[in-house]
Design a protein with these regions (language model features):
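Conserved catalytic-core segment of NTP-binding enzymes
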Residues: 1-82
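Short, polar/charged, Gly/Pro-enriched helix-capping and turn/loop motifs at alpha-helix termini
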Residues: 41, 121-125
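C-terminal alpha-helix
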Residues: 109-121
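C-terminal boundary of histidine-terminating zinc-finger modules
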Residues: 88-109
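Long, low-complexity intrinsically disordered regions
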Residues: 124-144
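Short, contiguous clusters of charged residues that form electrostatic/catalytic patches at enzyme active sites
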Residues: 25, 29, 105-112
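Short aromatic-enriched loop/helix-cap "lid" or pocket-rim segments at secondary-structure transitions
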Residues: 58-60, 87-90
């Protein structure tokens, strides 16, 4: 609650599962309580669907419910992905662990969508969308010689 009391905005991640809808309802009420009592500027900037498996009816139903009740839901959804699950165990973000994975691409899309929303509110100047970073490697000869 302290983080919400100090924040200007919150992004709520929601797993595409039934009980997550219940949790989203509770968290929305908590945000509203904090807005009334502690932080009138607190805003839900968006809801992010995560662990989304488009092959299941449940995920699609949860998505429909979330989008119906929370119009600020991000277009981007984060898919359920083995590579996303593996990355933390290797101590790396997905954009380093497997930059070409669907999860990495989804997070890059989310970053671009956030930038777009900030631009629409004139909070940042117009910028180019994120592009995958080039991998820079130091040739072995430079590593050995400390160049």
């Amino acid at each position: 609650m302290n983080a919400l009391a100090a924040a200007d905005e919150v992004i709520i991640p929601v797993q595409a599962e039934y009980f997550a809808l219940e949790g989203l309802g509770h968290l929305s009420k908590t945000v509203e309580m904090i807005r009334r009592n502690l932080n009138p500027q607190l805003a839900i900037r968006g809801v992010l669907l995560t662990m989304y498996d488009s092959r299941t009816n449940l995920a699609r139903e949860v998505e429909q419910e979330v989008r119906t009740h929370f119009p600020a839901t991000f277009r981007t959804v984060i898919p359920r992905s083995v590579r996303l699950a593996e990355a933390p165990s290797h101590g790396e973000p997905i954009t380093v662990y497997d930059p070409s994975s669907t999860g990495a691409r989804a997070y890059e899309e989310l970053a671009n969508e956030l930038i777009e929303r900030l631009r629409e509110r004139d909070l940042i100047p117009a910028v180019a969308p994120m592009r995958p970073r080039a991998t820079v490697t130091t040739p072995p000869s430079e590593v050995a010689h400390g160049a």
